């Protein structure tokens, strides 16, 4: 399986969501933003494309965000986000195409009232991925808490977004590892990995979207098209692992 990684520092926090509540600052639950430093309720593909990023690959101008996590009522700032762009569960990875500029996607369900599918949301302690669960672990003894969210990898080929922000995308794992006729364009499988420095009992965790079950994340593609295309060619289509460059020192 091919993959290329991008490490991104936390950028900012705000009660904004340019996908679900565009043009309405303060209308959303609080989110933590990574990547593009300008992301806000008024963001557009054009406004994102010309701005700086907190990511280690400077031509990744995409916006990434997830709901704020609270521990015993206190906001916890995630100390790192790693984006993993993978070939994903596809019978024929050679058909993968770049994301169209301006594509918006959501992974997970912010209104969930029970654990979500492990293939979409996945909690673990540090890097014990296979031992993680779709619900929060009881405790992380001496290691950080991690949340991974997996985005859909089949696009309808027409719409950069949809009314419910989900119908234009679907998961190949739901269709026998193929992209269905309704969503024929295979794109990279994006997995966002968030790390929180919470060590100890996790029974007082909640997300800004509601309960602990509502883990979700949003993505707005503003990659430089040629940079994304080259990483897909070099890493995904050749089944290679391309690790993230190191993050530059903090200013």
What residue ranges belong to the model's regions?
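Primary mode marks residue(s) on the alpha4-beta5-alpha5 output face of response regulator receiver
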Residues: 1-28, 32-149, 156-251
């Amino acid at each position: 399986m091919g993959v290329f990684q991008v490490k991104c520092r936390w950028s900012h926090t705000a009660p904004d969501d340019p996908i679900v509540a565009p043009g309405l600052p303060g209308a959303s639950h609080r989110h933590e933003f990574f990547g593009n430093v300008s992301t806000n309720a008024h963001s557009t593909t054009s406004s994102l494309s010309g701005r700086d990023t907190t990511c280690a690959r400077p031509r990744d101008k995409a916006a990434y965000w997830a709901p704020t996590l609270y521990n015993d009522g206190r906001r916890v700032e995630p100390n790192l986000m790693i984006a993993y762009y993978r070939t994903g569960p596809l019978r024929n990875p050679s058909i993968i195409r770049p994301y169209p500029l301006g594509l918006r996607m959501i992974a997970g369900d912010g209104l969930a009232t029970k654990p979500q599918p492990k293939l979409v949301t996945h909690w673990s302690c540090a890097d014990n991925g296979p031992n993680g669960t779709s619900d929060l672990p009881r405790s992380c003894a001496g290691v950080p808490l991690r949340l991974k969210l997996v985005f859909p990898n089949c696009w309808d080929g027409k719409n950069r977004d949809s009314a419910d922000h989900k119908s234009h995308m679907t998961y190949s794992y739901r269709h026998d590892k193929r992209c269905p006729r309704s969503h024929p364009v295979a794109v990279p499988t994006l997995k966002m990995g968030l790390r929180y420095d919470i060590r100890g009992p996790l029974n007082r965790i909640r997300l800004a979207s509601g309960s602990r079950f509502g883990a979700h994340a949003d993505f707005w593609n503003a990659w430089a098209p040629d940079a994304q295309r080259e990483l897909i060619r070099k890493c995904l289509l050749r089944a290679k692992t391309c690790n993230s460059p190191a993050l530059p020192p903090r200013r």
